[in-house]
Amino acid sequence: MRKLYCVLLLSAFEFTYMINFGRGQNYWEHPYQKSDVYHPINEHREHSKEYEYPLHQEHTYQQEDSGEDENTLQHAYPIDHEGAEPAPQEQNLFSSIEIVERSNYMGNPWTEYMAKYDIKEVHGSGIRVDLGEDAEVAGTQYRLPSGKCPVFGKGIIIENSNTTFLKPVATGNQDLKDGGFAFPPTNPLISPMTLDHMRDFYKNNEYVKNLDELTLCSRHAGNMNPDNDKNSNYKYPAVYDYNDKKCHILYIAAQENNGPRYCNKDESKRNSMFCFRPAKDKSFQNYTYLSKNVVDNWEKVCPRKNLENAKFGLWVDGNCEDIPHVNEFSANDLFECNKLVFELSASDQPKQYEQHLTDYEKIKEGFKNKNASMIKSAFLPTGAFKADRYKSRGKGYNWGNYNRKTQKCEIFNVKPTCLINNSSYIATTALSHPNEVEHNFPCSLYKDEIKKEIERESKRIKLNDNDDEGNKKIIAPRIFISDDIDSLKCPCDPEIVSNSTCNFFVCKCVEKRAEVTSNNEVVVKEEYKDEYADIPEHKPTYDKMKIIIASSAAVAVLATILMVYLYKRKGNAEKYDKMDEPQDYGKSNSRNDEMLDPEASFWGEEKRASHTTPVLMEKPYY
């Protein structure tokens, strides 16, 4: 038995070692490469300038009346580079002693930079209407905003009314339409509160005092307990006004209510429920809408400024290409384009309503009978009725490219994976500020990534190869655009990219191994799928480390459990008859205890609150 334990332990450690390091794999070997997957740059896989791309018409980016120079070279591929100019002079790209090979790994140098534009990941909730979470207050479930990023320039328009939504909600004998959305007056005053007042108020709170103004405003609103329910995890949203540096807590978390069945736009009917909708309006450009979940490092992980001289694109094997299928709208300026993107962005607004307007009937009845608690309970729900609690999770038309020359706003719902340097464009998102612009395009990104990849591969080659001839081998990454012509290691003359503020060069004589499909999806070409079948998708190194740690821990736990099981089995085996006659064994006395109680949940022995439908499964509508 001891020998068996030793064998199991050795097997577990060997398995862990294989997961972490592989059999005979060198430490410096690229994690996504096989040892013999490199091909010389002049092999048949890398075609010359005359190579005919068979999918020109199918995937060519179309744009009507672009207004741009017909000789402009777009970064899109496989579009023809008809207007591309040759380099000013022929370059001696390779030393006579250099052997240059091209890597087969199709990595994306923009992965880290573009992480903040993965809105589904970084925000995780609706933008136009954010009702991404549910919370209980005094025994009743309500919806509330839950986005992790600030929404710059967002406010609420009350239809046919001069009342601003930042006015305190109506209370007492006030008519319903006399109030707005903000917290009613309190003593001491908690809303609105100036930035200086908040800093002083939380000066002794180590967790809050050093936060930036937006996160501080979000946490301040989260400190208020609704309906004196200290056990509730409901948190109010807030709006921060950059103009006067004030934090407004919103008593009403609803963001949209339209239609004659649900509201009345008649200003004269003061006691009827008002209609309202979210918007990015000129009067709101200093406002920022905040949920309880705004992360304290939002400046690093969330988009704020629009990107000048840039358009969102898709990384397709070595270059950033245009997104072929977009929705195009006219827009006079960036503000209008950003507003359009916001209107089409992810929304958690209910798709259907109950036949009986329970919540709004409460409001009317509350005012009629002067029942303050009824009015409060009616205002607390966040604009959604019980019949429909749709959650977008941040999926929507959240991105746009604004063409300043044609005054067109191109809106799309696919996550961009790179930026195209184009002086005619500004890239924007539904979260971004409607006016603020970032002017610095990261021109050196390609050159820096190429240098880093070549150095990493050189270390691997130095450890694995014994080259006695003195030839220096270079493994060039699959990056075919750079502001440094020599870094491309191109087998033909690179071409100058027109309309680029970075003076980029592009190498277009190496065949692409990926393409964009009709639904804006990047896929490996059919002829290369077998070659890339076993190569995992690119993940950051910290993800790989997590996998290694998790796998090691799992193996250790399994080995421990197995040893304990075998030890107990050994003890039980001593009680068994040596002839192994099953009729003498009997049954375990604890068998009934080991059986699962069908009335118990895996959370514990108590029944769930709703035993028949513990979780509501909804069909997503994308």
Swiss-Prot record:
Instruction: Give a yes or no for keyword Signal in this entry.
Output: yes
Q: Residue span of the signal peptide, if any?
A: 1-24
Q: How does it sit in the membrane?
A: Single-pass type I membrane protein
Which residue ranges traverse the bilayer? 547-567
Q: Which residues lie on this side of the membrane: Extracellular?
A: 25-546
Which GO cellular component term is one of those annotated? membrane
The answer, when asked if Transmembrane is one of the entry's keywords, is yes
The residue spans the entry assigns to the Cytoplasmic side of the membrane are as follows 568-622
Q: Which top-level group of life is the source organism from?
A: Eukaryota
The intrachain disulfides are 149-302, 217-247, 263-275, 320-418, 337-409, 443-502, 490-507, 492-509
- Extract the InterPro entries matched here: Apmem_Ag1 (IPR003298), Apmem_Ag1_dom_sf (IPR024056)
Which Pfam families does UniProt cross-reference here? AMA-1
Disordered, as annotated region: 577-607
Protein family per UniProt: Belongs to the apicomplexan parasites AMA1 family.
Known function: Involved in parasite invasion of erythrocytes.
Name used for this protein in its record: Apical membrane antigen 1
